[in-house]
Amino acid sequence: MEYIIQEINSSYLIVGYIDDNDPKENFVEQFIDEFIDKHNKNIIADIICLRIVRNPNEIDLYVLCRSNINLKILDSRFKNINDAILHICSDNLFLPFEQVDDYGIISLLNNRTNIETGTITMLGKKLNYSLIKTESVDKTWLEGSYLELIKRKFIESPFITFETISDAIEYDDKKEDIITLKQYIMIYNDKTITNPENRLQYAVFSDSKGFLIFDDNREFNQIFNNHINYIVHSESSDEEDNDDDIINNDTNNDINNDDIEIKT
């Protein structure tokens, strides 16, 4: 399946394209049966298009939505086959919406081996989290429509966390060794928690942008294996040092890392 990101109705959606050069008689039913399951984590697409190229000027696209997306956002002029699928006939290999750069998000989401899920306890409640291990974090992932896409992809997790290698180190007195720290970028997923009171409670764990960025030598599930009651944010007074404290030492990134104290 070929994945791209297209801007549809002011949202960034992942669209998957599958080619079928020899469609069988019941290919539409087979297409629906195979891809309608929204819980199949191996498919990251919001929308899947079955593409049949009959000739360069006659290309059929059978469009299936897997996320909670109303088919009407695609276009009212498209022919409805049924409530689950649309049929578009044109000379275009793709849906007629702007394609945008994925900045590595598709590869990130498609590599399930680097994504860990579990639970942490905050304010006496167990909450799901998703931990994404990656060599670096592009600042684009943490902005605008790209961030909204990532939040939607982890809709079951109130907290989404990126794990990278930090530039910071510490000395282990017992082992008499230098330890490279991990950097964690926790994102509060406001799409998951809809209750206004709960939103306010959990939002205080992050900064004004909805992030909590900190370094630690422990695995993420070890940090949060106790009950977390509150987190203290203290802005660095040294602006020059703060500017240097960016994600994974990537010059394209400009997210500042505050001093974090986690209270249990």
From Swiss-Prot:
Top-rank taxon, per record: Viruses
Organism: Acanthamoeba polyphaga mimivirus (APMV)
Record region (Disordered): 235-264
Residue ranges with Acidic residues bias: 237-247
Protein name in UniProt: Uncharacterized protein R522
